[in-house]
Design a protein with these regions (language model features):
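Alpha-helical transmembrane segments of multi-pass membrane transport proteins
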Residues: 1-427
């Protein structure tokens, strides 16, 4: 009953437009006072500090800054030109370019919002010029950008790994196959729509154009190789890889492409600071809520109540998917992770689900939730760029959401899909 009151209070505050971080912190502090006493407030400042200073979380601002640098230093534009030269000649090619570029960008930024801002600001206006509807342009940009929280290095996985005390590198490896499946599914859907609605082609395929685009994008292509190669090869941790991503983006954008001056760098840093502040404030205030939840042993109570109904992993995963989809529809991805992970981890451990497997289930649910109103943070960003109504765009976006849902079902009930590479490399 207490857990239901907490969730109801959070949703009530969010629905009256209280910032999510403030809502979580308020519920946490009130819970501490009511159930632990006023004297327990002395623990709140230290809990706030400790919650936001876990070492793995250092990767979050660094990857956010790397994404901002990519967006302002010509790196993302060169990736767009390369993918256009590769698949633009296919009917509906610009939509497929959108998917491909989002997957490339995801391998560096790890953020769906950064992805949609970088790719959407360039591709959505181009798609509208070529007679793609604003709704379709916004929908495919949003759906493909959501792959950024599945494809490594995902900020959502870093956050989950830090909270669940799970290997972030293994989470990254587990996200490779689901991310590719999601991208292929969206590309196939684009091809189907292109044939059905006679969508335009770009210029005819040209080997010389492809060669030129590849030469210009070569250094941009080295970024994911450096970052992911270093992490997967065991040469660096995810946090160190994030630092290398920033350094590489600075060198490539500033010294090689020469598009990164002090003014551009200042703008990128400011954008990065704003995005980081949002995430880290959520992390800090959620630690206070976690203090209250732990003291009340609410996660353990939830595990006992669900296992009293069923211990069948199939049924439990179905219930968790419903819960996660609903949370993803109303909460920012980071807020949903911070809220749900401490609550459900005892249940996950009790029924024998691998935390890595559950991490992929969680992030896929959030990818779908980011596309689904009423909040739909990524879809809303895409619609603002396309200047189109979010509810009208949602109608067009439903088949793309269905593609992501199919990937979710495969990952949920065929654990080998996310876990095969993990077991191959780490035993």
């Amino acid at each position: 009953m207490t857990l239901l009151i907490i969730i109801a209070a959070l949703f009530a505050l969010v629905l009256i437009n209280v910032p999510i971080a403030v809502a979580i912190g308020t519920v946490g502090v009130v819970g501490v006072v009511i159930f632990m006493g006023v004297d327990a407030l002395v623990n709140v400042p230290l809990t706030l500090f400790n919650g936001a200073t876990k070492f793995p979380l250092i990767a979050i601002p660094l990857f956010i800054l790397a994404g901002a640098l990519m967006n302002t230093s010509g790196i993302s534009m060169r990736l767009i030109n390369l993918v256009t030269a590769m698949v633009g000649f296919v009917r509906g090619g610009l939509a497929m370019v959108n998917v491909g570029v989002s997957m490339f960008f995801a391998e560096i930024s790890g953020s769906a919002v950064a992805d949609v801002a970088a790719t959407g600001s360039v591709l959505i206006p181009e798609m509208k010029k070529r007679k793609y509807t604003p709704q379709f342009s916004a929908a495919i940009t949003s759906s493909s950008a959501s792959l950024a929280i599945i494809i490594p290095p995902s900020l959502s996985m870093i956050l989950y790994g830090a909270i669940a005390d799970t290997s972030i590198v293994k989470l990254f490896v587990a996200g490779i196959i689901p991310g590719i499946l999601g991208g292929l599914g969206l590309a196939m859907l684009c091809y189907y729509y292109a044939r059905k609605y006679d969508m335009p082609r770009e210029a005819a395929f040209s080997l010389s154009t492809l060669g030129k685009a590849f030469r210009e994008a070569f250094w941009a292509l080295t970024l994911p190789v450096i970052i992911l190669g270093g992490i997967f090869g065991g040469f660096v941790t995810a946090t160190e890889g994030a630092g290398i991503a920033v350094l590489a983006a600075l060198v490539i954008g500033g010294l090689i492409y020469r598009e990164l001056n002090l003014q551009v760098l200042y703008r990128a840093v400011i954008d990065g600071v704003i995005q980081t502040s949002v995430v880290m404030l959520l992390v800090a205030t959620s630690a206070v809520l976690g203090l209250f939840l732990t003291e009340m042993q609410l996660p353990q109570q939830l595990a006992q109540e669900i296992t009293a109904i069923t211990t069948d992993p199939v049924a439990v995963l179905a219930l968790l998917n419903i819960l996660l989809l609903l949370l993803g529809m109303f909460l920012h991805g980071a807020a949903a992770i911070i809220l749900v992970v401490p609550i459900v981890m005892p249940l996950i451990q009790q029924i024998g689900i691998d935390p890595i497997h559950f991490g992929l289930i969680l992030t896929l649910n959030l990818a779908i939730g980011q596309q689904t109103p009423p909040v739909a943070s990524v879809l809303a960003t895409s619609c603002s760029i396309a200047k189109t109504d979010m509810w009208e765009t949602t109608k067009v976006n439903l088949p793309m959401i269905f593609v992501l849902f199919l990937v979710l079902m495969l990952v949920t009930y065929v654990p080998a899909i996310p876990m095969s590479l993990v077991e191959h490399f780490y035993g």
